[in-house]
Every structure is written in C-alpha cells, then in structure tokens.
Regions:
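Conserved donor-binding loops in enzymes that form glycosidic bonds
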Residues: 7-8, 130
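His/acidic metal-ligating clusters that form di-metal
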Residues: 39-43, 121-154
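Core catalytic region of metal-dependent phosphoesterases/phosphodiesterases
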Residues: 2, 9, 13-118
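Short, conserved structural micro-motifs that define repeat-unit consensus positions
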Residues: 1-2, 149
C-alpha cells in the first residue's frame, strides 16, 4: 500500500474565485494525479479542509471538485480517507454536520468526524478531526488510550 497525504485544499477559496479554481484544477490534472499514477499510489488521506466555505458550497465548486478530484479517484479505484477539518463544518462546536458526509454519505471512502483508529496494512493510525467543545474530552481520551504510534489530524 502506498499512501498520499493531502490537506487544506479549500475548494471554493476566495469566494469561489475562478483564478483559484483554475490553479487547483491545474494542480490535480497536471501534478497530483500524474504523481499518483507514476508512483502506484492506491490510497489518499485528506487531512481536512477539503472545502473553504463553512456555511455553503456553490454548485460550480462542487462540479469542479467532482470533476478534478472525486472522479479521478474513482477512475483509479483509489481508497479514500478524509478527516473533517474546521472549514468542512458549518458550526464550530460540532463535527456531526460536515460537508463530506452531507455531500457523499457513505458512498465515497471513509470520513472521520470523530476520533478513531484506522488500519493501513496493519499499521494503526489515530485519525483526529477538528477538535471542538463537543468532541474535546472524547478526543483526549482516545489519544491517551490508543496504542497507535502515528496520528493524522487537522
């Protein structure tokens, strides 16, 4: 298994600026996914803040995100994991409502909105989403109780 880590992609940045969108799509089309192909990477872990706007996502941004990130992963049968970041949630005090879960449900990869362990070829990794008032105690308890030697977080 080979894993690519990516974080803070902020789709829809700067009020859905076309300049930023063009920059993002160029990166995915000409750098990121060609690298994935060249290095036989089969898993992508996004460490949070896939989207930029906390309160809403425009249809134009969703289409670009789908066409240049989600579909290329599907075309390659990529195993996708995503940790919820602070820009992926509309409320600062809970991760329960989050952009990825609301858009995709359980149809695209594994989404971590609560702290939990994941296993990658037997390597245990603690997945730590955005910490807020609601999940703080649980997150700390899971950090103290895990025997994972690696943690990915936002």
């Amino acid at each position: 298994m080979k894993i690519a880590l990516i974080t803070d992609t902020h789709w829809g940045a700067r009020n859905d600026s076309q300049v930023f969108t063009d920059y993002f799509t160029d990166f995915y089309d000409n750098v990121f996914f060609p690298y994935i192909d060249d290095h036989d990477i089969d898993t992508i872990v996004h460490l949070g803040d896939i989207v930029d706007r906390r309160k809403f996502i425009s249809y134009v941004t969703l289409r670009s995100f789908r066409d240049h990130f989600v579909q290329p992963m599907a075309d390659r049968n990529i195993n996708f994991h995503c940790i919820v970041g602070n820009h992926d949630i509309p409320y600062r005090n809970t991760n329960d409502i989050n952009a990825m879960r609301e858009i995709f449900g359980s149809s695209v990869g594994k989404i971590y909105w609560e702290t939990q362990e994941a296993s990658f070829d037997g390597l245990k990794i603690l997945m730590m989403p955005w910490i807020n008032n609601t999940n703080y105690n649980s997150a700390i308890n899971k950090m103290e109780q895990t025997d994972a030697q690696v943690m990915f977080g936002h």
